[in-house]
Every structure is written in C-alpha cells, then in structure tokens.
Amino acid sequence: MVLIKVLANLLILQLSYAQKSSELIIGGDECNINEHRFLVALYTSRTLFCGGTLINQEWVLTAAHCNMEDIQIKLGMHSKKVPNEDEQKRVPKEKFFCLSSKNYTLWDKDIMLIRLDSPVKNSAHIAPLSLPSSPPSVGSVCRTMGWGRISSTKETYPDVPHCVNINLLEYEMCRAPYPEFELPATSRTLCAGILEGGKDTCVGDSGGPLICNGQFQGIASWGDDPCAQPHKPAAYTKVFDHLDWIENIIAGNTDASCPP
C-alpha cells in the first residue's frame, strides 16, 4: 500500500501514495560530513520532517508537500545530537509554489521555493549547490541523501544523514506499478531507484536532492511504502524543467508561471 510519507496532517492530498517528506535512506551509508554542505533540514517544533537544498545564500528548494506552518531551517547540520560549530538557523521569509492552489496532486508540480529571512554565510559545512546546466540522462548513476528512515519496516531514524547511489530510470518504471492512480503518460518527474530493490529514499527524505553526474537534478517527491521494494522505484520532481520558474522567482518576478 502506498501512502504519503510526511506527517498525518499532510494527508490533504487525499491519496494513499508515499510522498517522501518523511522518508529516509534505505540501503545506504552515512554521508561524509563534507559531502552535503548544501543539504538543509526542515524542522517543525523539534521534529525533522523533510530535507531541502540550498541553491544560493538566500534560497532553498524543496518539495511542495513539505510545506508546514512554523518551519525552521537548519543549515550546516550533520549530527542531530552534536551540532557543528558553523550551523545556522533560518525561517522562511516567503514561500513560492508552482501552482497557486498548492495542488501538487498533479505529481509533477511537487516543488517549493523558500526565501530565507536572511542570507546565510558559506562555511566549512555550508555552501549552495548550483542548478543544473543540462537535463539528466536515463542510465545515470545518481546520489540522494537525507535523515529519513533507514528501515523499510521500522521507525528507525539515523543521527546523521545517509547517502545512497541509485540509477535514473525511464519514467514508465515509476508509472507502471500503479495503474490505479492513472498517472500521466508523460511527466516532469524523474524516476530513480534500483529495480531489484534494497536502495531507496524513505519517510523523512522528502524534499532532499537527487544529484546525477554532479548536477542537482531532482527533488525527492513520492514512492512506495514499504520503501525500497523491487520494481517500485521512487519519483523526483525534475529540477531542470522548472529552471525558468525558479530563476524568475529569484529575480523578483513573483507572477512567473510554471511549465505546462
């Protein structure tokens, strides 16, 4: 059964699909402390519920279904228990969605741009990740990461982010297992995973990056639950297809429209 991988109050989608806002990495290893300077953690109260990506000193890109009230954003974090000296905290100044109705049930509009309340400073553990200069290719080896669940069946969450390498697959590989959802034949969504299973994002990883050949190509969006099942890869919002919208919003054109 597929369900939204966020918190219960995000089930406004009225779908039983696994949106990975609460997902973690399955089948990976602890990330090196120096390999995720762009990775941010989204908190509400004391709960880490999503990831995101710092794309410049003032903007974070994440999934639309990660939107919640009272979001706090931690940058430069590795261990949840032992803070880095250069960690910084911010809150959203503005949030922008590809659809004004925030109706990300269209599957390929699960993207949110957050303007921080003040710019961050680069440091040993904080630096932005550039937007992609070209689209990704099927067959690419991609890396994804997050503080999400590390067990597909148990509520086991790590202290530090986990990283895993997965493959970029044809979109149909994500569409075919779920005929009941009548997903569109084409989509601005990337499909990534390991067909034999065992490696995947999971609950708590939503909003985090998918990096293919060194470029930021995807935002963790939805997948099956339990995670990492054979022939059930996960879906990621395609960053490249939203470049014009992202760049227009950052430039101050808040009326910018999403790609059709």
From Swiss-Prot:
This is Snake venom serine protease pallabin-2. Belongs to the peptidase S1 family. Snake venom subfamily. It is found in: Secreted. Its EC number is 3.4.21.-. It comes from the Eukaryota. Monomer. Residues 19-24 form a propeptide. Disulfide bonds join C31-C163, C50-C66, C98-C258, C142-C212, C174-C191, C202-C227. Residues 25-251 form the Peptidase S1 domain. The active site is at H65, D110, S206. GO terms for biological process: proteolysis. Transmembrane segments: none annotated. PROSITE patterns: TRYPSIN_DOM, TRYPSIN_HIS, TRYPSIN_SER. Pfam families: Trypsin. Expressed by the venom gland. Keywords: Disulfide bond, Glycoprotein, Hemostasis impairing toxin, Hydrolase, Protease, Secreted, Serine protease, Signal, Toxin, Zymogen. Glycans are attached at N103. It comes from Gloydius halys (Chinese water mocassin). InterPro entries: Peptidase_S1_PA, Peptidase_S1_PA_chymotrypsin, Peptidase_S1A, Trypsin_dom, TRYPSIN_HIS, TRYPSIN_SER. SUPFAM superfamilies: Trypsin-like serine proteases. Residues 1-18 form the signal peptide. The gene is JZTHR7. The keyword S-adenosyl-L-methionine does not apply.
